Amino acid sequence: MGSSAVWVFLTLEMIIAVACCLGNVLVIWAVWTCGALSQPTFCFIVSLAVADLLVGSVVIPMAVLVDIGMNTSFYGCLFICCIIIMLEVASVALLLAIAVDRFLRVHIPLTYKSTVSKKRSWIVVALCWVTAALLSFIPMFGWHNPLRADSTECRFFTVISYSYLVYFIFFSLYLPPLALMTGLYCYIFLTTRRQLRANIGVATKSCTYYQKEHRLAASLVLVLVLFVGCWLPLFLMVTVRLYGPHIEVPSVAVDIGVLLCHTNSAVNPIVYAFKIPKIKEACRKLWRRVYHDREQQQSEQNNTQNNTDRNKNSNAENARTKDNSTENRSATQQPVL
């Protein structure tokens, strides 16, 4: 890319980073304040928000340093790239955990609470992160591009092997979970729709339960679709580079693919805030509180200003009264000629 294109790219990266940090901190705060962390699904959502927050606070700043020409050792660059891969693998694992949780919620509604406890859900979250770390740091043990020099200009595709990205990440850790999640959500929608049709015109707890599950599943499917839409273009371009080395994939297209991947971490909080009722209500309460505090602060400032003005007017009136009294006494005390 030319220098102007590089600066446009870096500016967009920084905007996305700020959006990632602000949005995901808001989501984590909203889930925390509304007390939803006791529910397994929200444990997974918060963990996914943490992964997105790390993209904005760690990955994108590293990418910016790389793009402005930071030099580092080969294995230092490889370590940074493995962290980037780890967050993507962790996101896939957490999305799969959310899909399985929603499946169990619909498949075993009567025994769900005893089967999926808060403790077990956090154990699953920990397993997702540990597994992602173990699988993502495989390049550190040999599956990487040949070592070219003791120091290098750090570029992702300079150190990470296309074969590792395509065969291991894309074909093994991306497509199979995606197919499984698609099947689980299809089952969820078919089951909830069948239950709702069976209870048409009947206001029961069962009907309310399945309506709630259907709406939440639809919101989470949107998160999944956005994830696929943002990450798939980059994976496809990498696959083309592996299988068709004679086919030129423009570097600008790859950079746009990277931007899309990072954008996904900034878009998720918007989906949570507008589509998931508990998070939406918590965000509304936060907005009301901020707006109310601002109004109250403005009102206090106005009252203080009014009191100050009244005191000034009162002091001025007292001064005028005192001057008039002094003049009257002086006139009275003058001798009559």
Region locations from a protein language model:
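Class A (rhodopsin-like) GPCR signature focused on the TM5-ICL3 interface and adjacent 7TM helical core
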Residues: 94-107, 139-147, 169-203, 219-241, ...
